Design a protein with these regions (language model features):
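Short, composition-biased motifs enriched in small/polar/acidic residues
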Residues: 456-526
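Hydrophobic alpha-helix-in-membranes signature
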Residues: 13, 227-229, 473, 513
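Short, structurally constrained coil/turn elements
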Residues: 20, 141, 489-491
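C-terminal PAP-associated
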Residues: 26-456
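Bacterial N-terminal signal peptides
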Residues: 11-25
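N-terminal secretory signal peptides that target proteins for export/translocation
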Residues: 1-10
Length: 526
């Protein structure tokens, strides 16, 4: 808190004097807004559970793509559009006949290198099921998209749980394979040159297929690593080992920018924590499904480090397990768990920025009334060249429902199957996370949250436009700071709060106020 605003920056414009100052701030929740809910998908005629919670942040928008729905929001949380996933694919050029069997397992990412959005989903055909992949025509997701599709499996197998990764040269999709009877039969992986997908028209002509890979070698639920940085010369696949616990499988993708990509020798990486999780408890006695120990959300690389998180069993309770891998030498820089003896922690997602900040977000539940309601938590960490530290979990949104269940389902009730956390592409200090949360005993919702890890001093900037002043300050600024104005900076001056109707534009809070007749001073104060 400050008692006066030091004159760090000074502008003089006709009839008005404006003073701007900078203030220290810490890591904080900037905002949260409600995403798509079961009520929304019911209205669209595509209601299902679980939603497969998924989203991504771009320069000016947040996109939510879940089972049954595709929604676009401003960064201030205003919903601009909501359509079914069926209509999304049809608008992008996929025929109704191709997707008539139904759809599942949505993924969406924003790629800073190409300034495009990428999305994937799979059809529910018993045989010949299709993998759908789309990209936006520009960085604006409200504009047009173009999509392609290909058969997911050779033979009489059906795909499940597609994954999506993008790096400087490739777009990667992984799938699990199942027989018609539902038996798991292995995994497949597809490497698509990114330049081919962003071309007009997009093409799959140079896609490399790795069909029916041995999951005992490559692992399960193959994750092509998302890497926003310029090329390392290769891509990376990360997966949980399927032959024994406490192993992560890493495979290099060579030549992903062209036809004929190849896979390197898989390396097994030892880790400390691993066990299949149990269903998560609720105060009302019902349980929810927490899946298994797979990497259900994106695996991300920043610089030389790869960040991953999964759900495991620690003692008798589910825990969030995080790992940071040094990509060049396949060694763990650090790993740890978020756990305690009275709560279950599940469906994590992780992201990191270039200054070493990490955000890990997840659900928490337990058997104790109120405290055990399914809620959203997060933890902040730091990575350096010598190791990784992760802080204690903090509350993002307290749940209000103690007995979530779903009509037509049975305990453990379906939940997840994933969440998503990412760095804002316009500000390395801003992190977004989208998580599932109950909104009624028989209805799920989703919540989008913006969290700042900034440690720098934000600046208040003022410009004049005709008879108005445009005030802007970083979106990463702690919302506890309020904008105030006064006619002078004298000790006796009365500072009045300026009503904050700011909107987020790219990575700035922007507010327009009328130009005053006399001197005006502005400050941020907490």
């Amino acid at each position: 808190m400050i008692s006066s605003c030091p004159a760090r920056q000074l502008w003089v414009i006709p009839a008005t004097l404006i003073l701007a100052c900078t203030l220290l701030r810490g890591q904080t929740i900037i905002q949260s807004f409600s995403g798509v809910s079961l009520t929304d998908t019911t209205k669209l005629g595509t209601d299902t559970t679980p939603p497969d919670t998924m989203g991504a942040a771009g320069p000016n928008h947040f996109v939510e793509f879940i089972n049954g729905a595709f929604a676009i929001y401003t960064k201030s949380g205003v919903r601009l559009s909501l359509i079914s996933d069926i209509l999304f694919w049809e608008n992008a050029g996929i025929s109704p006949a191709t997707i008539s069997a139904g759809l599942t397992d949505t993924r969406v990412v924003y790629d800073v290198g190409s300034h495009r959005w990428f999305a994937s989903e799979i059809t529910l055909d018993t045989t010949g099921a299709q993998v759908l992949v789309a990209r936006s025509d520009t960085s604006d997701p409200t504009g047009t998209w173009k999509a392609l599709h290909f058969t997911g499996n050779t033979g009489t197998r059906s795909p499940d749980f597609d994954t999506l990764g993008v790096d400087s040269t490739g777009v990667y999709i992984g799938i699990d394979n199942f027989s018609i009877s539902g038996t798991f039969t292995g995994v497949s992986f597809f490497s698509i040159p990114k330049a081919d997908l962003v071309a007009n028209p997009p093409s799959l002509a140079n896609m490399t297929r790795f069909d029916n890979l041995d999951n005992m070698i490559y692992g399960s639920e193959l994750q092509g690593v998302n890497n926003p940085d310029p090329g390392t010369g290769h891509g990376v696949i990360i997966a949980i080992d399927n032959k024994q616990f406490q192993l992560v499988d890493r495979t290099t993708i060579n030549g992903s920018g062209a036809a004929g990509a190849t896979l390197g020798t898989t390396v097994d990486i030892n880790n400390t924590y691993d066990a299949y999780p149990n269903p998560a408890a609720q105060p009302g006695g019902q349980t929810v499904d927490t899946g298994d120990d797979r990497f259900s959300s994106f695996v991300r690389q920043v610089g030389n480090n790869i960040f991953m998180a999964n759900t495991i069993l620690q003692g008798s309770k589910d825990a969030v397990h995080w790992m940071v891998l040094s990509e060049p030498n396949n060694t763990l820089l650090g790993e740890g768990i978020i756990s305690d003896t009275t709560h279950d922690y599940f469906y994590p997602s992780i992201a990191a920025n270039h200054s070493g900040g990490i955000l890990l977000a997840f659900n928490r539940s337990g058997s104790t009334s109120s405290d055990g309601n399914i809620s959203i938590y997060a933890a902040v960490g730091t990575v350096t060249s010598t190791g990784v530290a992760m802080g204690s979990p903090f509350l993002v949104r307290q749940g209000t429902i103690g007995n979530f269940h779903f009509a037509g389902d049975s305990a453990p009730y379906r939940w997840g199957d994933c969440s998503a956390t990412m760095v804002d592409p316009t500000d390395d200090n801003l992190f977004w996370t989208i998580q599932e949360i109950p909104i009624a005993p028989t209805s799920w919702g989703t919540l989008v949250t913006l969290i700042s890890l900034a440690t720098n001093r934000p600046s208040l900037t003022i410009t004049r436009s005709a008879s108005n002043l445009n005030l802007s300050w970083p979106a990463s600024t702690d919302p506890a700071y309020v904008l105030q104005s006064a006619p002078s900076v004298a000790p006796s001056a009365t500072w009045a709060t300026v009503p904050n109707s700011a909107t987020i534009v790219i990575n700035q809070n922007v507010l327009t106020v009328p130009l005053a007749a006399g001197p005006s001073y502005y400050r941020l104060k907490k």
